[in-house]
Amino acid sequence: MSAAIVNAVKQCGYFNQGQCLSCRHIQQPLAQQVAVKTQTLQQLLAPFIPANSAELFLPPITGDDSGFRNKAKMVVLGAAHEPVLGIVGPSGEAVDLCDCLLYPADMQALLHRLTRFVQQAGLPPYRVDKAKGELKFILLTRSQVRGEYLLRFVLRSHNGIERIERELPALLAEYPQIKVVSVNIQPIHMAILEGDEEIFLTENTRLEERFNHVPLFIRPKSFFQTNPQVAAQLYQTAREWVAEFSPRSLWDLFCGVGGFGLHCASNDITLTGIEIEAEAIACAQMSAQMMGLENVQFMALDSTDFAKGKSAADKPDLIIVNPPRRGIGEALCQSLSEFAPKAILYSSCNPKTLAKDLEHIQGYHLTKVQLFDLFPHSDHFEVLAMLVKD
């Protein structure tokens, strides 16, 4: 990325007018944002870095500062004849976010079309204050490989499904790149994003994505990185770091749809992927099948429980962990220390819990740390840390 782009300030009308403050650092140049994040990371990990070892921190990886996000979570507001897709603003007003700069142009256009779809279907937006209405959220996910979409309508009940089905053929004829459509039923009168019941309105139930020639699949409830450009670099870096150890066996804990493990896999490596979300495991299994991988096992289990149930004799050469923001926790840290693999690759979306976990992983030292700016304009970022056995 050129210096001019990195040092430019993004102009966002929503932020300037005080309507949406989610991108709290959008008025800072990207280079400045990344410098602050780098400093934060270095301070948090300072206790684990030997003196005169600043070279452990590799240069941060950045991507575009707009049009990078592949997922939109839109609250549906307003009325059936005049719906608004966006957020509730700071003053309680409905803010239309269809032109949010984080979304690619084709995604912005589709969001505008979905506003008209809601109007044509006559779907009344759910009113939290009155506990009335039907349509709560519209969730839209984009695959960068073909510009295809997964579209979800979150409803209070089954009452709105018929209206969606009535208008859907015209929408799909206009936007054939919408490959998956589903309705999620969320009956609870609370600000919860989704419920347990998912009803597919298309034959397709998953969206294909591809990073570094690795096929990955997205289903409605499976977690997937929201910045494909930087996520692809994150997975590629993990692949290169793991290859340095030539492992014959590998665990991928909190594996999600298998992004890390599948990037590192080959038929010479025995790969075990563990993830509690069954939908994500189904996606990972499909990817492994497409890649022709034979020594691969993906299981829908709790990662901590899985590790506790294993003996030292089962230990792999290398373990990858990619936990949610809470980190891996003391119990799993203890299990990793006892298994004593050659190396542990830790991918973290919360450097505070990474630092906390590092206190409890015994017998290892950091050899590489790299920041990946998956979330421009926010305080958040991803970190890849390589721990090697003492």
From Swiss-Prot:
The keyword Transferase applies. InterPro entries: 23SrRNA_MeTrfase_RlmC, MeTrfase_TrmA_AS, MeTrfase_TrmA_CS, SAM-dependent_MTases_sf, U5_MeTrfase_fam. The keyword rRNA processing applies. GO terms for molecular function: 4 iron, 4 sulfur cluster binding; iron ion binding; rRNA (uridine-C5-)-methyltransferase activity. The active site is at residue 349. It comes from the Bacteria. It catalyses: uridine(747) in 23S rRNA + S-adenosyl-L-methionine = 5-methyluridine(747) in 23S rRNA + S-adenosyl-L-homocysteine + H(+). SUPFAM superfamilies: S-adenosyl-L-methionine-dependent methyltransferases. S-adenosyl-L-methionine binds at residues 225, 254, 275, 322. Keywords: 4Fe-4S, Iron, Iron-sulfur, Metal-binding, Methyltransferase, rRNA processing, S-adenosyl-L-methionine, Transferase. [4Fe-4S] cluster binds at residues 12, 20, 23, 100. PROSITE patterns: SAM_MT_RNA_M5U, TRMA_1, TRMA_2. Its EC number is 2.1.1.189. GO terms for biological process: rRNA base methylation. Belongs to the class I-like SAM-binding methyltransferase superfamily. RNA M5U methyltransferase family. RlmC subfamily. Catalyzes the formation of 5-methyl-uridine at position 747 (m5U747) in 23S rRNA. This is 23S rRNA (uracil(747)-C(5))-methyltransferase RlmC. The lineage of its organism: Bacteria, Pseudomonadati, Pseudomonadota, Gammaproteobacteria, Alteromonadales. The gene is rlmC.
